[in-house]
Amino acid sequence: MALFSVRKARECWRFIRALHKGPAATLAPQKESGERVFSGIQPTGILHLGNYLGAIESWVNLQEEYDTVIYSIVDLHSITVPQDPTVLQQSILDMTAVLLACGINPEKSILFQQSKVSEHTQLSWILTCMVRLPRLQHLHQWKAKAAKQKHDGTVGLLTYPVLQAADILCYKSTHVPVGEDQVQHMELVQDLARSFNQKYGEFFPLPKSILTSMKKVKSLRDPSSKMSKSDPDKLATVRITDSPEEIVQKFRKAVTDFTSEVTYEPDSRAGVSNMVAIHAAVSGLSVEEVVRSSAGLDTARYKLLVADAVIEKFAPIRKEIEKLKMDKDHLRKVLLVGSAKAKELASPVFEEVKKLVGIL
């Protein structure tokens, strides 16, 4: 699955080089050396179908493409809104189990808990001292999230994107897989790196976005909005841990329209098109192949077909999650080892930052 145009260009160049080397050359995947990928996910809430197709599948693939891949469970970000401490502790372990079950491999990537690496917050403070207040107040996500909180939102929520920038820059990350709703935050990351470099000399690379080719999975109950962990309608979101019976029920109740034919027309038939997009993503088929193979089915039967495809996709993952959650010591060890590896990378970067800023 193509993730961004630069990758396509690299693959073409490798192919050309292989042709010139003669019949002994191979086209085996090669990892990008000297480049670092970073991404993070909040531990709160259960991963849903949209998270999996829009982010986690890409994370798994990136492990095979880059030498250094760093994934963080960003617990500090999660406390920008109120959390129950006991629930949060369990959620961190649960998210670790989910990521491992989905294919995140600690032998191929670094998986760690954000709060265990103090360089994140230390660098965040330095970057906070470089950004103007209006810059943060004009970010779309701040406006949307602050509107949902009492008293206009917290300072932590406002400076969330600066901590996000520190997460990325403290590893000198070169690439960041992001969704469409994070593009504005990536612009802030690049601006902060650029500002730091202009003030203290060239130090941080300007991270590039890796945009997934998977469009946002829509709510099953309202295809005009994206699928969300926090949707109050329990039938709107398919969670990765849902039982087969729950998945069938949710797809059976999914909103489509009064036309029975299965077509892919996102602008005029959002509900059915969402079903087709999900079906294509979990089956590995193209949208066109899915539509052709579904000819003759009405939407009621088609929704059950999509449900079966999702159940088949999630069955081994769900089984592995249940197994991993039984061994909390193993999950804690994964995070402990990952945090040590992450700190080993972040510490020398921040030591250099301190020298440049003059706070050694």
Swiss-Prot record:
Its main location: mitochondrion. It is found in: Mitochondrion matrix; Mitochondrion. CDD domains: TrpRS_core. Keywords: Aminoacyl-tRNA synthetase, ATP-binding, Ligase, Mitochondrion, Nucleotide-binding, Protein biosynthesis, Transit peptide. ATP binds at Q42, H48, L49, G50, N51, G179, E180, D181, V217, K226, M227, S228, K229, S230. Gene3D superfamilies: HUPs (3.40.50.620), Tyrosyl-Transfer RNA Synthetase (1.10.240.10). It holds the Pfam family tRNA-synt_1b. Residues 1-18 form a transit peptide. InterPro entries: aa-tRNA-synth_I_CS, aa-tRNA-synth_Ic, Rossmann-like_a/b/a_fold, Trp-tRNA-ligase, Trp-tRNA-ligase_bac-type, Trp-tRNA_synthetase. It catalyses: tRNA(Trp) + L-tryptophan + ATP = L-tryptophyl-tRNA(Trp) + AMP + diphosphate + H(+). One of its GO terms (molecular function) is tryptophan-tRNA ligase activity. L-tryptophan binds at D167. GO terms for biological process: positive regulation of angiogenesis; tryptophanyl-tRNA aminoacylation; vasculogenesis. It is an enzyme of class 6 (ligase). Catalyzes the attachment of tryptophan to tRNA(Trp) in a two-step reaction: tryptophan is first activated by ATP to form Trp-AMP and then transferred to the acceptor end of tRNA(Trp). HAMAP family: Trp_tRNA_synth_B. Belongs to the class-I aminoacyl-tRNA synthetase family. This is Tryptophan--tRNA ligase, mitochondrial.
